A protein has these predicted regions:
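Acidic, glycine-rich segments characteristic of secretory precursors and extracytoplasmic regions
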Residues: 2, 21-79, 195, 494-504
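Long, intrinsically disordered, low-complexity segments
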Residues: 20-22, 39, 77-79, 119-120, ...
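Short, surface-exposed recognition loops and adjoining beta-strand edges that mediate ligand/DNA contacts
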Residues: 36, 63-91, 176-178, 185, ...
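Conserved, well-structured interaction surfaces
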Residues: 46, 54-60, 89-170, 195-196, ...
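Extended ligand-binding clefts on enzyme/binding-domain cores
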Residues: 58-60, 257-346, 419, 431
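Flexible, polar/acidic helix-loop-strand segments at domain edges
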Residues: 90, 94-103, 317-370, 376
């Protein structure tokens, strides 16, 4: 027990010393006592990996963003990056000016939301594990190569996911693959192209796949830590962005044929099982909040709401059965949102009647669920001209969710655009407010040299103020505007960076 406590204290010390530097990547060298006393046993590696996951939930004590702005948690950034430029959220009573500006595509490089420091902070934790853990095998005879590889797979996959998110959000970003271990490290790193970043992500995931476990022996770890199925799901997502459809289909099939996951039939306790409790048979990778470490959304979405569901979501996305009001999509009222108030309910609800108390708001952040890989698989099939195989996947999910007839679409399986539009509509229902909407539409809009720019433009003006719609459309016709600018602080502290041309 003393060894474990010492290891956990050591990793907390690493957190404090690693993130207090002023350079643009928010990294600090591992010189001195921390590095000398750590990285000696497999327990040290385990503590570092636990710390890596903990940093995905919230920042270590005493750590702030160097820009002086709001120190959002990773899930808050993931929510904002994936939702507030889309068509399913609206500004709430307590929305900030910076948040509102992003919803209307009025984005400046000084915008608080464009900070990437929390991402690079965790990336450095991953890099530190990847660089320093291998040497422990020569110091601890109880550490096996298989155990080491398992830990490395987790760090590689988390790093890959973070870079994947950055590439989808900012397009071209600095690609740092080694830990910051010395003051002599070069902090003036230029950006790498989006294609190069995605290629590195795919490379990391391929390596991680060979190292990963299929199970840790308990449900919480299987859902809260990286497994081979998490990696396969990430690969599916990444390959779709890279327009490598056979590879995406192959990765998705590894998950769907594993027998490890299943959809749960709609019932009175479906919401509680899947979301309020989490770690259900539908979960693939969930960030594990607990009552001792609450999620940030009780304040952000309920007590002082910065965002609400857009007015069109309840009827326009989920539909209403005007003949039988009891006939309702299980994902609709008192799951994704509260009808009438448009409160976003998914991360604060206990069941379909009762909201969690603040002290109980431990709903997870859902990085990937089984329905995600199913619909990504359907997307790959559609792009491969196999729409007849894609449509039944959509219908299977709709049946499990009790989707109503009003949202059903009659599509020609041979018409790729129709099938893709049906998939996007179903993804909107299935992943409402889970940080996916903007990325889903952008991924499909940009294919074949923006052949489907129309779906992005239509989405962008759905809830836009009438007097701003033409301005928004004019901006979004430039593909560079689909990505956020590099924050002005980072441009000032790293002269090697070059701003996105749209924001110059």
């Amino acid at each position: 027990m003393r060894t474990k406590i010492n290891a956990l204290l050591a990793i907390l010390l690493i957190f404090v010393t690693t993130v207090s530097c002023d350079n643009y990547l928010d990294l600090r060298p591992q010189d001195g006592i921390v590095r000398e006393e750590f990285w000696k046993t497999k327990e040290d590696i385990q503590a570092a990996v636990i710390g890596m996951y903990s940093s995905l939930l919230k920042s270590p004590p005493g750590v702030t963003v160097p820009t002086g702005g709001t120190d959002y948690t990773m899930p808050e950034y993931l929510f904002m990056f994936g939702e507030i430029r889309g068509d399913m959220v609206s500004p709430g009573t307590y929305v900030t000016t910076d948040q509102r500006d992003i919803t209307t595509s009025n984005i400046l490089s000084s915008n608080d939301i464009t900070s990437w420091h929390v991402f690079y902070r965790v990336i450095n934790y991953c890099n530190t594990i990847i660089d320093l853990a291998p040497a422990v095998i020569d110091k601890d005879p109880t550490l096996t190569q298989k155990q080491l590889n398992n830990y490395l797979s987790e760090a590689l996959a988390v790093r890959a996911y973070l870079y994947f998110t950055l590439a989808r959000t900012f397009k071209d970003v600095p690609l740092k693959l080694t830990a910051t271990l010395s003051d002599k490290d070069n902090f003036q790193l230029p950006t790498s192209t989006q294609s190069d970043v995605l290629a590195q992500v795919a490379k990391d995931l391929a390596l991680a796949e060979g190292y990963a476990v299929t199970s840790y022996g308990n449900t919480a770890s299987d859902k809260g830590r990286i497994t081979v199925y998490t990696i396969n799901t990430m690969q599916t997502d990444v390959y779709l962005w890279m327009e490598k459809y056979p590879e995406a289909l192959a990765a998705a099939t590894k998950v769907t044929e594993s027998g490890k996951f299943s959809l749960i039939q709609a019932s009175s306790n479906w919401f509680t099982r899947v979301f309020a409790q989490g770690n259900s048979s539908e979960g693939i990778f969930e960030l594990q909040y607990t009552t001792a470490n609450l999620n940030p959304f009780y304040d952000m979405l309920f007590q002082r709401p910065e965002f609400t569901a857009a007015p069109n979501v309840f009827e326009g996305v989920f539909g209403i059965d005007y003949v039988n009001s009891a006939n309702q999509d299980i994902r609709s009222d008192r799951c994704s949102l509260v009808a009438g108030t448009n409160e976003i309910y998914k991360f604060t609800g206990l069941n379909t009647d009762e909201r969690k108390a603040l002290s109980e708001c431990d709903t997870h952040w859902f990085v990937y669920r089984y329905s995600d890989v199913l619909l990504l698989k359907a997307e790959a099939l559609a792009e491969l001209g196999r729409g007849a195989e894609a449509v039944p996947i959509i219908e299977e999910i709709r049946a499990k969710r009790n989707a109503i007839n009003a949202t059903s679409q009659s599509v020609d399986p041979a018409n790729k655009a129709q099938v893709i539009d049906y998939i996007l509509a179903e993804r909107a229902r299935e992943f409402a407010f889970e940080g996916k909407r903007w990325f889903d539409v952008l991924r499909n809009a940009k294919r074949n040299n923006y052949e489907r720019l129309d779906i992005l433009l239509n989405m962008a003006v759905t809830n836009a103020p009438a007097d701003q719609q033409q301005s928004i459309l004019a901006k979004l016709r430039d593909p560079n505007s689909h990505y956020l600018p590099i924050n002005v602080y980072d441009l000032y502290t790293n002269k090697a960076l070059v701003q996105n041309p749209f924001y110059k």
